[in-house]
């Protein structure tokens, strides 16, 4: 209904992002495994194709793209910015590593 008025609706779905919020998410892994923050991020990203978390600037760039004229034809879609995590079955990987 709003498309002809130039209003678009999209979603951005990031994976792990190295931020203070992401750091807090790593605390249980750090405690459980006795590892550093950097090692915790490496542990959670070891099975995604890029093997690293995103930066806040990278996620901001995705937001800027979706808000810009360069994406004027993009609507009704989801931009997944997860380093390729969607391309692998992370549920299966976690199941194999941790068990039921």
Task: Please place each PLM-identified region on the residue numbering.
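Active-site catalytic pocket residues across diverse enzymes, especially alpha/beta-hydrolases
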Residues: 2, 29, 70
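Short, small/polar-rich loop/turn modules that mediate ligand/substrate recognition or access, typified
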Residues: 3, 8, 74-76
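A short alpha-helix capping/helix-coil boundary motif
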Residues: 4-6, 22, 40-42
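C-terminal helical subdomain
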Residues: 11, 19, 35-70, 74, ...
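Short-chain dehydrogenase/reductase
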Residues: 24-35, 100
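Short C-terminal tail/terminal secondary-structure segment
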Residues: 64, 75-100
């Amino acid at each position: 209904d709003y498309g002809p008025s130039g209003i678009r609706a999209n979603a951005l779905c990031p994976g792990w992002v190295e931020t203070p919020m992401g750091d807090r998410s790593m605390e249980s892994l750090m405690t459980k495994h006795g590892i550093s923050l950097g090692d915790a991020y490496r542990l959670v990203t070891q099975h995604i194709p890029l093997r690293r978390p995103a930066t806040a600037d990278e996620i901001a760039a995705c937001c800027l793209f979706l808000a810009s004229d360069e994406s004027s034809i993009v609507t009704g879609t989801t931009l997944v910015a997860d380093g390729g995590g969607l391309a692998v079955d992370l549920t299966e990987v976690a199941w194999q590593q941790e068990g039921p």
